[in-house]
Structure formats: structure tokens, C-alpha cells
Swiss-Prot record:
It comes from Rhizobium etli. This is Uncharacterized 19.2 kDa protein in syrM 5'region. InterPro entries: Carbtransf_dom, NodU/CmcH_Carbamoyltrnsfr. It comes from the Bacteria. One of its GO terms (molecular function) is catalytic activity. The lineage of its organism: Bacteria, Pseudomonadati, Pseudomonadota, Alphaproteobacteria, Hyphomicrobiales. GO terms for biological process: biosynthetic process. Disulfide bonds: none annotated. Pfam families: Carbam_trans_N (PF02543).
Amino acid sequence: MLCLGLSGRLSRVYENSFDLPNSFMHNGAAVRVRDGRVIAAVEEERPNRIKHSNTLPIRSIQYCLASAGVQLSDIDRIAYYATEAYCNAVLERVRLSHPSTPVSDARLLQRARGGRHGLYIPVGHPDVPCDRHRHTDLAAHWTRDGTMPWRLSPALHRRDELENVGPGIDC
């Protein structure tokens, strides 16, 4: 199984489209894992040369894919370090403080931002159902208002693998 893990905000370098708190997007990074073993991992500050870069890890993703000679469509699972509920809560907070913010839904934001780079993955599409990730020690996050449950990380799974993962959640 080939997996790609991501962290970082959804803005490009030198772009701050959405005024998100720093707790929402720590340093941008990508990691490629095959059958439970880390094969490639790159923090976005390395390829873009901006210390503590928390941007969408485009170059890191490109490296992780190119180093294996694979395309995004070859990836079995993609994980992000925060739950959809947490992302939506942060985006709603931003929208309330800045009414001109165009998007307050994580899926729509991912479609708008990721699609520009050929990284859009149709969450909720029948071929890409959503399930809670069970190995969550890597994503032990919390918020003061309790919008994000401890140690939860979403992971996208292909439909034929869900039997091995357990019950899914409605995405």
C-alpha cells in the first residue's frame, strides 16, 4: 500500500489567501509511506528555501511522487493531520472575523486550492470514501474550544480496502 501524508496550509509561497491561525498549519511537509515504511519525507522549507514554510507542500509532494516514479493517482491513501470537523471550525472562525473570506468548507477549499496544482482528490466521491485513521499518535492535536477530538486524523481509503479498516464515517 502506497500512502502520502500531508501537513501545511493551502496557500502557495508568498500568498496568504486565508488568514488562518498558525496552529492550523504548522510547517508544510509531505511523506510517502509504502507498507508502513517511510520511503521519502520532505519538509517544504527545504525545496522552497523559506524557513518554517507552512505553505501547501507542492514541491515536497512532487519530490515524494517523483522519487518513486509514481503519480498521484497511484497513491492508495492520503492523510492530512487534522480532521475535517476541525478544519471546518477553523475556517468558520476565519469567515466570521473576515466576512469576505470566500470559503468556509474544507472540501470546497481543498477543491479550490488543490485543483490549481493538479492535486484535487474528490473527497466523498464513491471511489474515495472517508474513514477515520486508526494510527493516530502522529496527529495528537487539540484545540481550546474542543472542536477537534484528540488523536484523530482523517485518511482516504479506496472502497475495496474499507473491509480491512473497519466502519467508516459519513464524509
